[in-house]
Amino acid sequence: MLFRSLVTYLSLVSSVLSIASIKVEGNAFWDSESGDRFYIRGVDYQPGGSSELEDPLADTNVCERDVKYFQELGINTIRVYSIDNTKNHTECMDTLAKAGIYVILDVNTPHSSITRSDAACSYNTDYLQEVFASIVEFAQFDNTLGFFAGNEVINDGPSLEAAPYVKAVVRDMKTFIKNRGFRTIPVGYSAASVDEYRLPSGLYFNCGDDDMARIDMYGINDYSWCGDASMTTSQYSQQMKDFANYTVPLFFSEFGCNAKRPRPFSEIEAIYSTEMSSVFSGGLVYEYSEEASNYGLVELKGDSVTTNDDFDNLKSQFEKTKNPSGDGGYLKSTGGNKCPPKSNIWNVTEEIPDTPKGALKYLKGLAEPTGHGFDAYVQGNCNAKGNNVDDTGNYTSSITASSRASPSQTSQVSSSSATSANSTSSKKNDAAVEGAGFLSVIALAAGIALL
């Protein structure tokens, strides 16, 4: 019995310690243990799409069904657009970690995000509570590669008014991660590849004196390489020029034009070549499952997965295309870029709004944020009671990184004043704690063996 328990515990510990976290240095990603440069080879993953919203990382059966196909493709990263922060994601994240797969997570849901129509009101305490609750849930996993604070919020002139609020969310997320004592997890923005806004957006989110308000990575949703295009007939060459001196990791957060199907994915050879590695760090193919937009690599029907020619072509391209050797000619940069000049196309203030006062208790690590998952309808909660009231004086103790609340099963969205500061449970997830437990079990086993 003791031996069986020991084996079970060793299996748990090995899984916890099975994958190195990814860090940012200069304009590249790096394996924190080996020191090797890390290139994103991945797919965008949201089975059901936005019309049938489900959390694929909370369903163990779905996760186990799909991870074998991730491995067959040879990918190392998935991007997930929405999760339910009331649920537990440990089993799936552990399954992915064992397969060597990282997750880039968008922290927003359809009704909990910065809106283009009223960015000021959607940036409120209840919204930030949802964001912070998602961070608490996923910061515990070493294979959480990073978080996106927004996706394609800026796509035309009127939407520029939302830019300062998205940047404020970046600041709040990074501040929350730091103050809670979590490891440094990259926070970024995923941009629509609209010619006139792609570069200024990238510069804007990576400029200014406050490094907490600057992104750590920038994703571009690009579909300019169609069929058997080239660096010049697509927009790849232009983007290489535009971002030659960009100081944080840049990658394609979506790519894979479907004007011609099956897609040949000939761009893979370019993306993972020395011609692009000085600026780009890989990308994510849109998308894993066939949805209404017809970009899928597989067809899902219940527990059944059927791969298509797109899947086979992508697999073949990944198999024959290796990453550049060494550091790939990365830019050893520090600090941000210059802010984009104002023009008739780009007219955005460099000042960003203050954090709603009701959210300060979370930023200061005094209260545990409570998520409400897909039931969070908070975009109009700027007038909610307590949204802009500093109630930090009501709290006396701080929450550490190794103390976190179990996922809430709350079914109703509470107002800003109805937060659960006392919902913290001491669930230890720090690798050092697991390591200490590991040594204790070894010592116990050794003692038993001597009897």
Curated annotation (Swiss-Prot):
Compositional bias segments (type: Low complexity): 396-426
UniProt gene name: PGA4
UniProt family annotation: Belongs to the glycosyl hydrolase 72 family.
PTM: The GPI-anchor is attached to the protein in the endoplasmic reticulum and serves to target the protein to the cell surface. There, the glucosamine-inositol phospholipid moiety is cleaved off and the GPI-modified mannoprotein is covalently attached via its lipidless GPI glycan remnant to the 1,6-beta-glucan of the outer cell wall layer.
InterPro entries to which the protein is assigned, alphabetical: Glucanosyltransferase, Glycoside_hydrolase_SF
Consequence of gene loss (knockout): Leads to decreased caspofungin sensitivity.
Active-site residues from the entry: E152 (proton donor), E254 (nucleophile)
Lipidation residue positions, type GPI-anchor amidated aspartate: D430
GO annotation, biological process: fungal-type cell wall (1->3)-beta-D-glucan biosynthetic process; fungal-type cell wall organization
Signal peptide: 1-18
Propeptide residue interval(s): 431-451
UniProt-annotated binding residues for (1,3-beta-D-glucosyl)n 2: E152, R198
Induction notes from the record: Transcript levels are elevated during host infection, and transiently increased after induction of hyphal formation with serum. Expression is controlled by CWT1 and induced by fluconazole.
Region listing for Disordered, in residue ranges: 316-336, 395-427
Topology of the protein relative to the lipid bilayer: Lipid-anchor; GPI-anchor
Subcellular location: Secreted, Cell wall; Membrane
Name the record gives this protein: 1,3-beta-glucanosyltransferase PGA4
Gene3D superfamilies in the cross-refs: Glycosidases
Top-level enzyme category: transferase
Molecular-function GO terms, alphabetical: 1,3-beta-glucanosyltransferase activity
Keywords recorded for this protein, A-Z: Cell wall, Cell wall biogenesis/degradation, Glycoprotein, GPI-anchor, Lipoprotein, Membrane, Secreted, Signal, Transferase, Virulence
Glycosylation: residue positions: N88, N245, N347, N394, N422
